[in-house]
Amino acid sequence: AQSQDYRQAVRTQLIAGIANSYYTLLMLDQQLAISRQTEETWRETVASTRALMNAGMANESAVSQMEATYYQVQTSVLDLEEQINQVENSLALLLAETPRHYERGVLAEQQFPVGFSIGIPVQMLSCRPDVRSAERTLEAAFYGTNAARSAFYPSITLGGSAGWTNSAGSMIVNPGKFLASAVGSLTQPLFARGQVIAQYRIARAQQEEASLAFQQTLLNAGSEVNDALTAWQTSLSKSELLDKQVASLQTAARSTSLLMEHGNTTYLEVLTARQTLLNAQLSQTANRFSEIQSLINLYKALGGGQE
């Protein structure tokens, strides 16, 4: 049973690791696409700002600031490409394969069947290897306590019309003769009652210890499940707010660019609007990954679920 629990724990950890790497790739892919799109936008902005400078509507400082931001975005693109390569190598290691490019989906298109409005029954924690192990320890301690209690009494049964029977269930024809010949073995557990009581107390203490350990294991497991559920719920709440933030910032970025072209705003406002939009889009993508990651953590916290 312990080896089965170990295999289940390793299997769950491996599946969670593979899933985490896969969805990390999807997150990085989307962040890379956003950064490349932003890179192209900044390239056009640098060109238009330079044209404004040549027309006397912008200064060299504005062009330099725009170029610096453009180069910064290019650097971010290279960093993301490197991260993608590293995660692909990690995924190949988990799959025991030669590192390669993995065909994959798109983060925005990922759908998960979720419905935790009524919570998760605590019985589902029984799939966890550590909970199963603690449960078996408690069962063994419970049976040990009952065995110690049964030693209080001789192995003779009074069965009414069936008369006297021994531990094998055979009828004792002459109880008097049986008691006379077996008085030594019969009285031994009675006179050794103090020792039996001590054994019972030890077994009882072991049962209480196992019970406390089982309760603590359940509490720890439940805490992990609650943490995963809380993270999932938080990500869902943040998702709606981030969507609204990105939509507002997209409008602001377009407006400031148009205003600058007509000389009604400064390049600093354009820089701020564009940079804030990029950060919000990257955060939006990271939050979507956090939502998925919380479900992966929930899978782990539940011990991998049912086979």
Where are these regions (language model features)?
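Sec/SRP-type N-terminal targeting helices
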Residues: A1-R11, S61-Q65, C127, R132-R136, ...
